[in-house]
Amino acid sequence: MASNLSPAASASGASASPATRVKSATSTTSQFGYPRGHVGYLSADEEEALRSFQDVLEERGLYKRGPPASHDDQTLLRFLRARRWVVEDAFRQFKDTEDWRAANSIDTLYKTIQLDAYEQSRRLYPQWTGRRDRRGIPLYVFEIRTLDSKTISEYERLGSKSTFSQAKTDGKTPPGLLRLFALYENLTRFTQPFCTQLADREHPAVPITMSTNIVDIQGVGLTQFWNLKGHMQAASQLATAHYPETLDRIFIIGAPMFFSTVWGWIKRWFDPITVSKIFVLSAHEVKPTLEAFIDPCNIPKKYGGELDYTFGQLGVPDPHWEGVIDWEEGFTGFPTGPLLWEEVDDGKRVACVTYGSKGDEPRRQRICTLPKIWPATAAPEVDAENVAEGTATKTTSTAVTMTDVSEATQTAEPKAHDDGVQTDDAITNGDAVKKLQMHDEKHAEAANSAPPALATTVA
């Protein structure tokens, strides 16, 4: 069984050395505003907002302090960040999400979904490459052309009456979309916690709570976009409402001349903060821009990098994992299907365990273990340069489990695009990296301001 589920071996044939710290050419702290606003790097106002949010949730029966706490700090922070630190707005979105999760048995869905149904969904939507960007954030790729109208119709037809799991639903969210959210659970409960436990990054004391995405729209015509409009709108709005701030940078590649029309639809599916993180790259901007944020060895060859990765395959194991992960049962990489991390060895290590069902049999197999480095026993030291002057405070997480963690760092009014965005080489000026850096600095400067609250997204 293990040999059938194990992904392809690493693209690099050379023997790998134990993990070493990955750094960008320039400090990620100054270049991206990262890790400002994350656990351990909150301003005084943000720290106060978090305490107030915890108090409100506890008073209204949605949060228990523990230990362990019912929800870790980074989970709460992503709702605060999505609502621009306005506590009551964050509460409303948090409550809506908790109600939605309970009504649709999201935890049960993820743990019991049929492996074939999960794999069918996985092959259609964003996929983890097995690699990370220069900050240690997981890199996903999404090829839109796989989502043609025939494929989506068949997908929705087969799943129109079932989530292929033991989950009971409220009947309001289409089963096909609920199956999609098993993939979001995989992001927040497997991939991000795994990347958090890898110390080969500039800020290992900060939990990984985002994802970097390459969205490839090459070969997609206007008719296909139009046919997918309803499905993608519903999926995007539900994700924005119930998995807020799971995305960081989104690089769109291969945009045709008519993309300004499509962009007019897309930007209305997301909240403004998410929209501000979407960047459309012209052909000559792709390689230099991606290399500024992702090491070439982790960029798929198709986009000018060195990674032998094809959309649809399982993630390619990273040589940096050597000496860190202890594989078991013949595995050399992570299999498809739901995966969760569980503490073992008195909390000194974490084990990856398979979930879901294969036929009538539940999957429960240990894949590997690795040292548990987060949460640390002591609070991370905060460099005053990383937080607005005079406002730095330390934040510790009370989490001992690793579930549903995702957030982002954007808090300023987005100005990345307008209705007339153009993407062809003749119009873009080729200064994508410079524009991205200026964009980040603008957001970092505004991190401690109090912009107006956003209305809660309604699916």
Where are these regions (language model features)?
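Basic, amphipathic alpha-helical/coil surface patches used to engage anionic, phosphate-bearing ligands
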Residues: 2-459
